[in-house]
Design a protein with these regions (language model features):
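Mid-domain alpha/beta scaffold segments of enzyme catalytic cores
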Residues: 1-265
């Protein structure tokens, strides 16, 4: 029996969460049912083979549960990344995007390792281009570097998830077609508030990044909290919440394209 919500009846789309993460092993089904009751569609983001298997198995027969697939940016293992890329190729018709992938200069501070990190990132940029899928990018403490690398590679179908950089590079990226998803940690982040003030509503999507980046630091986040992101955007921009929700859904459908309707969950 199907369990989930169809895209055309969604209240909101959580464009980036990690329901396949082990933090949800004990109650993944219950969390998803709670999202279903709230009218949420989820885009899961497995970043290793185990999570991808979990996502594919859990998503079977559940409308409203989609996925990208990528590689943890701080994990410097090119061989492992290539193996993950092969799994992604094999799962192409069950995916709506590649990611999250990217650069992380918060956890990887040794500059001698940055070239290897960029090598892995370029592998997945090439894969997204090959498979004609959009790219979801992790850029912790590396926002400007990620944007420059993507622009130099000529890749612009990009979602910058939980972007933590300055607004200047973000504005440039937005002008090139990049979009940005806002996590519920916005309620405790002046940087995220400034980003939302600066970027146009039509470049903003919602995300939870669950189990991370919740409203309370250190507590497990859940996908339902992407609605807190929507409320914060509405407050910052002084517009009705309904406007934020409808704009974010429209942009999510444009970004992920027909995959959200056609993908085999």
């Amino acid at each position: 029996m199907e369990s989930g919500i169809h895209i055309d009846s969604a209240l909101a789309i959580d464009a980036h969460c990690h329901l396949s993460n082990s933090a949800f092993n004990s109650d993944r089904g219950r969390v998803f049912e709670g999202c279903k009751e709230r009218g949420l569609v989820l885009v899961d983001s497995p970043v290793n083979p185990e999570e991808l298997r979990t996502s594919l198995e859990f998503g079977s027969g559940r409308p409203g549960f989609y996925r990208t697939a990528g590689w943890e940016a701080a994990r410097l293992d090119y061989g492992g990344a290539k193996e993950m890329a092969e799994l992604i190729r094999a799962s192409r018709h069950s995916l709506v995007g590649i990611g999250e992938v990217g650069l992380d200069r918060f956890w990887v501070r040794d500059r001698a390792k940055w070239d290897e990190q960029e090598r892995v990132f370029r592998l997945f940029i090439g894969l997204a281009d090959e498979l004609d899928l959009p790219l979801v990018v992790h850029s912790r403490s590396a926002g400007s570097a990620c944007i420059e690398l993507l622009l130099s590679a000529g890749f612009r179908k990009v979602l910058m998830h939980a972007y933590d950089g300055s607004v200047g590079p973000a504005l440039r990226a937005a002008s090139e077609g990049f979009v940005f998803s806002i996590p519920p940690s916005i309620i405790r982040s002046e940087q995220k508030l400034k980003l939302v003030r600066t970027l146009p509503l039509g470049r903003l999507m919602l995300e939870s990044d669950a189990p991370a980046l919740g409203p309370v630091k250190g507590e497990r986040n859940t996908p339902e909290n992407c609605l807190l992101s929507a409320s914060s955007i509405a407050e910052v921009k002084k517009i009705p919440l309904e406007n934020v929700l409808s704009s974010a859904i429209k942009l999510s459908l444009e970004f992920f394209g027909s995959s959200l309707a056609a993908v085999s969950t």
